[in-house]
């Protein structure tokens, strides 16, 4: 039996975020197209070279992108909306689809399954000519071969997942469009095979959550492709969960290899293999190293997995690989020497995970004695972090044990609370507000950097933050907003900021991962028990409130979002970590309230993304996610108004969960998803305060008043005006001042027009 090492995908952003910087330099016209393409090629080849040097045998090619791999596939197959037809060059079309332009609305963006990565949603239009517009995987395969002598493994997004992620067609059209994808995929695979590709990875992550009928439909497409390309060696790759429910059918697909996730889908996939075996004529690609977290693998557990598999599987060959693409992990931990030894030793970023694959391969091919020293090191590291004082706090354990049922609910029901809040807050019909953050200008970022580097004092930094806060309080008053925010100028990131002020968190210097486009985030590391230390937002919020007679809302990030946007310890259930965060936030909310803050927003944009892929697992997750929010927010007085915010989700799946949060007001992204949540509300009722975002903040274009008014008008057809709020889709941190002010002025004017119409019709 041959055993090979493989990787499913490598982080794109570069060790020092060179990829991000190159993109942004190109967008701002600081470099030309030739310089852009040259630099991107250098980064791309460097990533291949690193994997080659680490000892990976099957190196992914084509996982690199200028923005998003789903967008790459859409462009490649000709899924280009007609509104972009005036653009002629590849990059102009590509980036217009991703980012929009002054006159063109960008394609929708949403979460990649249950991760914090966003993809550009492919759009189908009637009359679309589906064809292989550009065989990008072939070009990149030949590039790696010619430049580095690497016979790589092309990686493509599979036809079924691609079309399932697309929008713009009816369910009745799906089968027809799916068949139209056969020809371009046949051409793509034929050309790769003819060029010498030994194995081609076809990603089908959606296979973890398909019905029996859908799997059969997918199989027919693969049979049609195989008929035309009989000799190509295809690796059907699944990840993010098991394919247990459809395993028996999936192993009959006409492919040479099947990749399964034995980290996040371990139990289900092992159960399926135990029940149905594995085809002797296929290669099993074993996802055994976690591609979504940053902890060292338990190599003893990994080797036990292979022992189990080798007893049950008479497979042709084995492939040792991560559970999914390493896109979701930082690149290398070597710069994180500021961390404690016990934490540093416990980490494994992308490059370290490649080393773990090679260690596993050595143990499997040469015996465990060949890595005996490494195994002993790993065991010691795991023992040290498990027994750490940071993971065994008695006060945190006691607080969790003391929780009672009444800690998870507000004293009065929503209708009675809202009446009291209206009396206390004296807000107009259709109140306007923003989601929280205002532009983080170059000056803001530079001043924060100088403060962190000790160039300016704490006092100077605080004075600067107060100056920015006052400036934007005045802007908001002049614009005419009803509920103001302080602007969050002191915050780098909505999760990092809180993590820096809570026990149990640690932070990397260079642990960046891609969120969307050039936007990178540096998730906190939750390594110990989480606990409140001191007030985190009191000073800035109270100062902002002192500057105005209008209501200023406190701004917090919710427990589930902090959890889902962090790298989380893996020694206790995520539910328990979420409850720890909720208890810490509960303390902060009580301090805000006692300081005179009457509206407090607790953002949960990541609540939906944490849901398991399989519907059967949803209830358990939603129960503890909702309970976490309630635990954080339920101790305030009835007169205190609790807001929350969500963005980029398939909300129809969680309307009941949103209702169960019992927030007085929820604001939801609406504009970029082209009003999908409005459609959801046509089929269900939502009886609490709600604001459906009226403009897309991820695009630089300033929408007109009429565009926003149209969304307000549509929203009021399904929402009670008494409970309706008007707000942007999301925070305005990444936009420029000259974009924000006119957009908010248009929004306020749209609100005034809507109020006038309601009064006229009353």
UniProtKB/Swiss-Prot annotation:
It is an enzyme of class 2 (transferase). Pfam families: Meth_synt_1, Meth_synt_2. Its cofactor is Zn(2+). Pathway: Amino-acid biosynthesis; L-methionine biosynthesis via de novo pathway; L-methionine from L-homocysteine (MetE route): step 1/1. GO terms for molecular function: 5-methyltetrahydropteroyltriglutamate-homocysteine S-methyltransferase activity; zinc ion binding. It catalyses: 5-methyltetrahydropteroyltri-L-glutamate + L-homocysteine = tetrahydropteroyltri-L-glutamate + L-methionine. Catalyzes the transfer of a methyl group from 5-methyltetrahydrofolate to homocysteine resulting in methionine formation. This is 5-methyltetrahydropteroyltriglutamate--homocysteine methyltransferase.
